[in-house]
Amino acid sequence: MAIVVRLDDLLYERRMTLTELAERIDITLANLSILKTGKARAIRFSTLEAICQVLQCQPGDLLEFQPYLGEA
């Protein structure tokens, strides 16, 4: 299974840069970049809440579950 982070899509739809989001939620650009590229192993609920508040979205808009092919 894989969790896909749709941050790029949400930023594009809202015409916002990653840098602007990082400043607005007070997180380093490096950490937000790790999340955006799907390399993060975890996300704090406080960070998820801040992202959702700024982007006016739900957690399910940001994170998507995609099962690997062949999994039942």
Provide a role label for each language-model segment.
Residues 12, 23, 53:
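Alpha-helical residues within the helix-turn-helix
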Residues 39-50:
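Short, basic-rich loop-to-helix N-cap that marks the start of a DNA-contacting helix
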Residues 16-34:
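Short alpha-helical DNA-recognition segment
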Residues 31-34, 47, 61:
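Residue-level recognition of specific faces of alpha-helices
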Residues 8, 19, 49:
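Residues within the helices of the helix-turn-helix
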Residues 1-16:
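A short, Lys/Arg-rich alpha-helix, primarily the initiator
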Residues 34, 41, 53, 63-72:
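Short, charged recognition helix plus adjacent turn
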